[in-house]
Amino acid sequence: NPSLTIEQFGTTGFGILDIKAIIHPVTIVEDYVNDKNDDKEITDKTRVIDDTAFNSVIKNEDNSEYKALSNYFINQTITDKNDYTGMFKDKNLIVIMMESANDIFINPEYYPNFYKLYTEGWSWENNYSPRNSCATMNNEFSGMTSLYSIYNTCTASKYKANTYYESIFNLFNRQNYVTFSSHDYTEAYYPRSTIHKNMGSGEYYGVQKLGIKYSNEYINWANDDEFMEAVLKIIDKKTSNNEHFMTWLTTVSSHQPYSSSSIQGDKYY
């Protein structure tokens, strides 16, 4: 949250970093290769939606611009299938959103595990992270709903009371999966326990409910290693009868301030 950062640390630190970047610019070399060309069966993408209501809107619309937009959208392909449909049927899903991370992690020397995941797994470049206030929660919101966040507000906070029928949680709920979500920090910034519930998460686990150590200061964030260990226990408990599950986990250890000492950061510095 840039606004909160300025309030807590002032503008001096950011100014110094900007000056440093001008005098000593850093060149980022992307040395990773992702040239996987999987042969996929062509999927039938015939439009599968009842357009009765949409046609009625178009028929009764007097504004020519709105009508043109509606005609554009109604002629787009809408299907519940794509090239990956059914590939992971009946599999469990763990989504890990890393707070404050970027593609610097895709480095075989310093981060071999991330590099392996990126180059040997699937990766997509057509993804854009909003660089605005509330960046973390706006990205989380987009990932959970496939909706763009609003650039000038914290979308998840402003619309936390809405019900999101097509969220990732509800998609899995309709398939009788056990769903839950978790973040290893408090709700001092974002109302996750409220919006996650309205998105269909079966249960939300904050840092207190996880029972792991944390600090109210920026100095020492909760330990993501302990976070993952706590989550594994939750999974074991919730799937004692071999139920399928889906969970969304948002980490915290790599959060700013990046120039300050921290327990997790010092382990690898």
Positions of PLM-derived features:
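N-terminal secretory/membrane-targeting segments
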Residues: N1-K91, N107-Y111, Y118-T119, N126, ...
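Solvent-exposed soluble domains appended to multi-pass membrane proteins
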Residues: D62-Y269
